[in-house]
A protein has these predicted regions:
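A structural signal for short, well-ordered beta-strand segments
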Residues: 38, 67, 98, 115-116
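A glycine-rich, hydrophobic loop/mini-helix early in the fold
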Residues: 35-67
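A short, polar/proline- and glycine-enriched secondary-structure boundary/capping micro-motif
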Residues: 29-31, 58-62, 137-138
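Nudix hydrolase/Nudix homology domain
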Residues: 24, 102, 107-165
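Acidic, metal-coordinating catalytic segment for phosphate/diphosphate chemistry
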Residues: 2-37, 43
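Short glycine-enriched loop/turn motifs at secondary-structure junctions
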Residues: 2, 64-66, 126-130
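The catalytic Nudix box helix
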Residues: 48-49, 66-98
Length: 165
């Protein structure tokens, strides 16, 4: 199925379900939706950073500190997180820790997100349609890179809040 045709859950400002529409309609209308964000760490406490493909419908080619994606209609945040880990990284049967929910709004994106973390060493099987490359970075390296490269703004916001808690 073309990702633009996937049916996603639309919510209101209080994260209450209001409709189900295609991803295309959601993006075109900048409708509030749900997404999961998974911070993937290795045993050295480095975080997995992925480079998004140029075909992504939002932030193409950007770096992202979170694996994850849009919650589909009928899915819970946790079901979505497990699906996204399997699709994007080939990671199955990993323990997820839920951290916090948040609302993020930008010019082209309005989302209620839930943040998870997990421990996974790799090697990963990257989904070529979504992930161009990926690598683990320590926090100092990540801060240096974030100052010089394009990162997804919601991903950086998630990491900043995660590190503060």
């Amino acid at each position: 199925m073309n990702p633009a045709d996937e049916i996603v859950q639309i919510v209101d400002e209080q994260n209450q379900e209001v409709a189900q529409v295609s991803r295309r309609v959601m993006r075109e209308g900048c409708l509030i939706h749900r997404a999961c964000y998974i911070l993937v760490f290795n045993r050295s406490r480095e975080i997995f950073v992925q480079k998004r493909t140029m075909s992504k419908d939002i932030y193409p080619g950007y770096l992202d500190v979170a694996t994850g994606g849009v919650v589909l209609a009928g899915e819970s945040y946790e079901q979505s997180a497990k699906r996204e880990l399997a699709e994007e990284l080939g990671v199955h049967k990993v323990g997820l820790t839920s951290h916090f929910d948040f609302y993020h709004e930008a010019d082209n994106n309005r989302v209620w997100g839930r943040v998870f973390s997990c421990l996974a060493e790799g090697p990963f099987v990257l989904q070529p349609e979504e992930v161009e490359d990926g690598f683990f970075l320590g926090m100092d390296e990540l801060q240096s890179l974030a100052a010089a490269a394009q990162f997804t703004p919601d991903g950086l916001m998630v990491l900043k809040r995660f590190m503060a808690e």
